[in-house]
Amino acid sequence: MMKNKYSLNEEEIHLFQQSVAGTKRINQDTVLHSPRRKKTSYIAPERIQQEQIDASYYFSDEFQPNLDSEGPTRYVRGDTNHYELKKLRRGDYSPELFLDLHGLTQMQAKQEIGALIAACRREHVYCACIMHGHGKHILKQQTPLWLAQHPDIIAFHQAPKEWGGNAALLILIELDEP
């Protein structure tokens, strides 16, 4: 039998009973305090749909950007410091939004990636994670090609293990100045 780490001897129990003598048990009040929620602004469904269309407009299946085939999947826009890639690789950025493409068709994946980019810009999210998975390697091959075509993508790199490893990409999105 294990001895309780915080067991009290009889003297301590008696002292406690004396100190709480004459107190009454409080009944639970019925007031429930709900956590304060961040005020979310209403976004018209038409605007969201237009943002998705605008963002997926850039994704062509015919265009083949010149991506480095050696090593992990990575890309940095020409006007961006290559140090951003190193920070992505090391996991210095934590993604705030995640997109899981498992089970989607190429067309659905393009729409969802477009929606993710639009949501990141709207919510001022600089780093996001796209999980394309392994599967038949179709989305794994196509996702970087689509992302490299989009003007709002600053850089992307194969995600560190904690964010999905070689089955995911961390992306940096260009944001409008607030």
Swiss-Prot record:
Its EC number is 3.1.-.-. This is Ribosome rescue factor SmrB. It comes from Photorhabdus laumondii subsp. laumondii (strain DSM 15139 / CIP 105565 / TT01). Residues 99-174 form the Smr domain. One of its GO terms (molecular function) is RNA endonuclease activity. Associates with collided ribosomes, but not with correctly translating polysomes. HAMAP family: SmrB (MF_01042). It is an enzyme of class 3 (hydrolase). Belongs to the SmrB family. Transmembrane segments: none annotated. Keywords: Endonuclease, Hydrolase, Nuclease, RNA-binding, rRNA-binding. PANTHER family: DNA ENDONUCLEASE SMRA-RELATED (PTHR35562), UPF0115 PROTEIN YFCN (PTHR35562:SF1). GO terms for biological process: rescue of stalled ribosome. SUPFAM superfamilies: SMR domain-like. The keyword Cell membrane does not apply. Acts as a ribosome collision sensor. Detects stalled/collided disomes (pairs of ribosomes where the leading ribosome is stalled and a second ribosome has collided with it) and endonucleolytically cleaves mRNA at the 5' boundary of the stalled ribosome. Stalled/collided disomes form a new interface (primarily via the 30S subunits) that binds SmrB. Cleaved mRNA becomes available for tmRNA ligation, leading to ribosomal subunit dissociation and rescue of stalled ribosomes. InterPro entries: Smr_dom, Smr_dom_sf, SmrB-like.
